[in-house]
Structures are given as structure tokens and as C-alpha cells.
Amino acid sequence: YYRRFFNRVVDKPSLLFIFTVTCVYTQPCYQAENEVLKFHMQEAFQRIQMDTRPDGFATVIMDELNQDKVKQLKDACHRMMVEGDFVKYENVYHGVLTECSSQSAGIQLADYAVGIMNGYLRKHLMSRGDYTFATDLYTEFVLPHLRKHANGTVVGYGVREVPSDSSIRQVLMPLFN
């Protein structure tokens, strides 16, 4: 099923994955959860703004999750827009919209891609269990559509550690570059 699903969407030239990663096992975080959520939103919004053509417009649509988490994410996004950022979000809707994944192929795609990335990272960082299926799907469907620098670098472009941490980045670089 997953391969059939991905085969239908991977031919879209605009398909691009950006993952923000927090390594909760090795990265102590002294920030409140709402601040970490804001960092995740900020990383994604900055990259979306950078990649949007001057005459283009982007909207972030995410899974409904649970109502408390959605409220936290929307509040984080609102604070990011109100408090400002070094990037001016001229081509990105200043909020997030939610949709039920069972009613949206785009949200299903994001859900599957996140699950695949989770399996790929678990295999390489935790070495528990058999993640062959996830790593095969990662190589076949996610890797070709990861946001990259012109020189092919993925970490820092399509995969961002949140909060920024050079030691985590050093762990991620061999997995993606």
C-alpha cells in the first residue's frame, strides 16, 4: 500500500520534504515545550519562505493531532509572527491550518514520510528492532525529495536539528550527507 501511495505522488516536481528533528534521548532541552514547538515551526517556515518563488504563496497544513497540541502549535506560530523573525514571511500564510489525515492525501503523505524518517533515524541512532522496511522506503521515496543545498548537503537544509546543536548535527551528518 505505501509503495503504491508514494508512487502516485513522487512524480510531482514540487514535492519537497523538510524534517525538523529533536533528539530527546541525547539532547537535553531546558526549554519549555511551547518554545521547542516554536523553534520547529520557525525552522520549517524559514525554509518554506526561502524556497517560495517571489510570486508564489505557501500554506502550512498539518494533521489535527490532539486539540491541546494543535493549540500549542498555533500559539507558537502566532508568537513567531507577532514577535518577529529575521525572515519576513511575505509568501507564507501567517498561521497553520489543520486537516484530518483520513480526509487528506497530503496529510497522509506527511504522516507516512514522518513515520519513514522516524524508522530511518531509529535504525541508525538507536539500533533497536528491524527497520528495513522504513529504510527501504526512505531510500526509494523520501531521500530523492529531501530539501538539499545545491552541493547536495541535506543536514541544515532538509533536516534541521531543533534546538540547534552542533553535537547532534555531527551525529546526523553521516546519515544524510
Question: Can you describe what each PLM-predicted range is?
Answer:
Residues 1-177:
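Phosphate-ester processing/binding pockets and catalytic centers
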